[in-house]
UniProtKB/Swiss-Prot annotation:
Protein name in UniProt: Polyribonucleotide nucleotidyltransferase
Keyword presence, Protein biosynthesis: no
Native source organism of the sequence: Sorangium cellulosum (strain So ce56) (Polyangium cellulosum (strain So ce56))
Residues in S1 motif domain copies: 623-691
A Gene Ontology term for the protein's cellular component: cytosol
Binding site for Mg(2+): 487, 493
Location of the region described as Disordered in the Swiss-Prot/TrEMBL record: 697-757
Gene that this polypeptide is encoded by: pnp
Subcellular location: Cytoplasm
HAMAP family: PNPase
InterPro entries named in the record: ExoRNase_PH_dom1, ExoRNase_PH_dom2, ExoRNase_PH_dom2_sf, KH_dom, KH_dom_type_1, KH_dom_type_1_sf, NA-bd_OB-fold, PNPase
Family according to the record: Belongs to the polyribonucleotide nucleotidyltransferase family.
Lineage, opening ranks: Bacteria, Pseudomonadati, Myxococcota, Polyangia, Polyangiales
């Protein structure tokens, strides 16, 4: 049955349709907003025995044909997911996963395919809404729906589903997943927004989502399939009670062990004790098929003990109260050859973070449906297995690492100086060396310190903190700076990053139905308190940005030339710029507006390159003195090159204070001499003088000499020695090339991103 429903949101129609495309999927919905269209399918297969996790995969796929483009590369087809697609996949996964039934372990796959892109409306939030609708109308057990809403603040007003152009101007940009009653996921950034402004944005998103939720419910009523019956497997009640009797008291003792490794060793011993006891009581054969359920029940008992300890006694696993921050240790400049480095440790979480400075040739090219863009600041987050005492194959970064890196990058990006203030490409790498919660926030704090250590003039220091929540019945506790166990066993992971003035990035995931405004406000208030504490500790280590760059960092010097002089620097086929690079060893980048960046760690090399560039683009200045080289001799004077490819005429009358009979008597080709620029006419012809730089003859003879020179100029040049008659013709001749032009340097400058060095 074909159904199409629409609702107006953000000033445009949001349309959901089903029953026309992908009818063999268990649920399929086409989402249209503007001319952007996303097809989302949901399929769930039979359960695989032996799984102890939920095998859900969410895939966001951009097809280049959606934007009228053909993929690059040899094969001319879409390959592996780009980073933006991975982040959009996570954006679907995070709010959808908690809404599946507890114990549901069937292979479930959600695929969002961008079929059309108008390059104005982003498809990520549409994919989330489409995934929710596809699951809701399918027979797959799921406790939705939710709706994805992008909220921006533009000129002080909140805007729903802002366009790509508007997002660039927004000082708040959030993606919010909303259910009927609550907010279930948040991801976004801001320009130092206050906590109250963030809450207002979240409430605006929740209000905006309600008509779309109505739309999904209407579609479910029209075409929804009956949900499959699902009953989560469970242990018999008597075995559950026996598990509690065996482990509860020991779990309480193990939970109070503050050292992570010792605590985990205690948990492992308890698991072994539980298995041995039940095996002896039930028999190995009877226990074997129940081992997975026994393991799950042990985790349930552990969660109950930890959560009760927090809500009843007000204490946490490591002995802290709800607001306390773990001990912090910071160190900077520990890697001598790195441009900027920092070691940040908070409790048992440790990261070493580096900053590397490069030139514009190191910018990252982003080629997506929205067009080609370039990033001059990027952050990479690594999480090696040894950081948690494990062994795993070393492969490329996983989705979690890419997501954590994007969050830390967003937190710092608004504090990076503009290119005209700091024309460097900046790469931060965070290596997690130890992890017991909040390693992404260690990347933010360490990244800020490494930027300051590198001499990057950031606008304000940034810190990050992860907040948690535990709700047991009518009691709840908001936790600052959560441990890994508090993240795993708790109900919320709420990361907040910002400066002393406000929030720059947030990320929130919850495992419960939703959060009230009161709990959100308390969490943000505690986060601000913790953030200021962490910033204080960071600034004790490095109060301000270092005034100088590392001696190993490239020095970028910027000069500006006229756009029509770019060809002089590039040369025919890039010959000139390649020659400068080969001669000096610098990196040179030329912008279309005439901005020239010269970079090298060797300041002398930069100076040599700049001298060459200035020489190539310099224009003769009237009254200035130049050391020139005689290029050509004529009977009326000499043509002297005073700047590269720029000649002027040194007339015979301007060679000396006395009458000159033959030019060759004063200068010869190849001679080097000082000359002064007398004038530059409209055609660019240059008149030079040597005479004005020579001392005047003294006394009466000098006066007569000046008089004779004046008469000589009035009378014209002497007769030719090599034949009868005078020179005739043009007295001035071609007096030099026009500044900035050369017959060998034709052709327009290349486009900005065609690298020139």
């Amino acid at each position: 049955m074909f159904v199409r429903e629409s609702v107006m949101v953000g000033g445009r129609a949001l349309t959901l349709e089903t029953g026309r495309l992908a009818k063999q999927a268990h649920g399929a919905v086409l989402v249209t907003y503007g001319d952007t269209m996303v097809l989302v399918t949901a399929v769930s297969q039979d359960e695989r025995p032996g799984l102890d996790f939920f095998p859900l995969t969410c895939e966001f796929v951009e097809k280049t044909y959606a934007a009228g483009k053909i993929p690059g590369g040899f094969f001319k087809r879409e390959a592996r997911q780009r980073e933006e697609e991975i982040l959009s996949s996570r954006l679907m996964d995070r709010p959808l996963r908690p809404l599946f039934p507890e114990g549901f372990k069937r292979d479930t796959q959600i695929i969002a395919t961008v079929l059309s892109s108008d390059k104005q409306n982003k498809a990520d939030v549409l994919a989330l809404t489409g995934a929710s609708a596809a699951l809701h109308i399918s027979d797959i057990p799921w406790h939705g729906p939710v709706v994805g809403v992008r909220v921006g603040r533009l000129d002080g007003e909140f805007v729903a589903y802002p366009t790509v152009a508007d997002i660039e101007r927004c000082d708040i940009d959030l993606v919010v997943a909303c259910s009927r009653d609550a907010i279930v996921m948040v991801e976004g950034g801001a320009a130092e927004a206050t906590e109250a402004e963030i809450i207002d944005a979240l409430m605006f998103a929740h209000e905006t989502a309600q008509p779309v939720i109505d739309l999904i419910e209407k579609m479910r009523a029209a075409v929804g399939k009956p949900k499959r019956e699902f009953v989560a497997p469970a242990l018999p009640d008597e075995i559950k009670r026996r598990v509690a009797q065996i482990v509860d008291e020991d779990l309480k003792a193990a939970t109070k062990v503050t050292d992570k490794k010792a605590r985990y060793d205690g948990y492992s011993s308890l698991k072994k004790k539980l298995t041995e006891t039940l095996s002896a009581e039930l028999g190995a054969e009877k226990l074997l098929p129940l081992q997975g359920l026994v393991k799950a029940e042990f985790e349930e008992r552990k969660a109950h003990v930890v959560r009760t300890y927090v809500t009843e006694e007000g204490r946490r696993i490591d002995g802290r109260d709800g607001r306390s921050i773990r001990p912090i240790m910071c160190e900077v400049g520990l890697l001598p050859r790195v441009h900027g480095s920092a070691l940040f440790q908070r409790g048992e979480t440790q990261a070493i973070v580096t900053t590397t400075l490069g030139t514009s040739t190191d910018e990252q090219k982003i080629d997506g449906l929205m067009g080609e863009t370039w990033k001059r600041f990027y952050l990479h987050y690594n999480f090696p297995p040894f950081s948690t005492g494990e062994t795993k194959p070393l492969r490329g970064p996983g989705r979690r690492e890419i997501g954590h890196g994007a969050l830390a990058e967003r937190a710092l990006s608004r504090m990076i100086p503009a290119p005209d203030q700091f024309p460097y490409t900046i790469r931060i790498v965070s290596e997690t060396l130890e992890s017991n919660g909040s390693s992404s926030m260690a990347a933010v704090c360490g990244g800020c310190l490494s930027l300051m250590d590198a001499g990057v003039p950031i606008k304000s220091p940034v810190a990050g903190i992860a907040m948690g929540l535990i709700m047991e019945g009518n009691k709840y506790a908001v936790l600052s700076d959560i441990l890994g166990d508090e993240d795993h066993l708790g109900d919320m992971d709420f990361k907040v990053c910002g400066t002393a003035r406000g929030v720059t990035a947030i990320q929130m995931d919850i495992k419960i139905a939703g959060l009230s405004r009161q709990i959100l406000a308390q969490a943000l208030d505690q986060a601000r308190e913790g953030r200021l504490h962490i910033l204080g500790k960071m600034l004790e280590t490095l109060p301000t940005t270092r005034p100088e760059l590392s001696q190993y960092a490239p020095r970028i010097t910027t000069v500006r030339v006229k756009p029509d002089q770019i060809r002089l620097i590039i040369g025919p086929g890039g010959k000139t710029i390649k020659g400068i690079v080969d001669q000096t060893g610098v990196a040179i980048d030329v912008e279309d507006d005439g901005t020239v960046n010269v970079a090298s760690a060797d300041s002398d090399a930069v100076k040599r390159a700049l001298d060459i560039i200035k020489g190539l683009t310099a224009e003769p200045e009237v009254g200035a003195t130049y050391k020139g080289t005689v290029k050509r001799i004529t009977d009326f004077g000499a043509f002297v090159e005073i700047l590269p490819n720029t000649d002027g005429l040194l007339h015979i009358s301007e060679m000396a204070h006395t009458r000159v009979e033959r030019v060759e008597d004063v200068v010869k080709e190849g001679d080097s001499l000082d000359v002064k620029v007398l004038s530059v006419d409209r055609e660019g012809k240059i008149r030079l003088s040597r005479r004005e730089l020579l001392p005047l003859p003294e006394g009466e003879e000098g006066d007569r000499a000046r008089e004779r020179m004046a008469q000589a100029r009035d009378a014209g040049p002497p007769p030719r020695r090599d034949g009868p008659g005078g020179r005739g013709g043009d007295r001035g001749g071609d007096r030099g090339s026009r500044p900035g032009l050369d017959r060998d340097r034709g052709g327009p400058p290349r486009e900005r991103r065609e690298r020139r060095s």
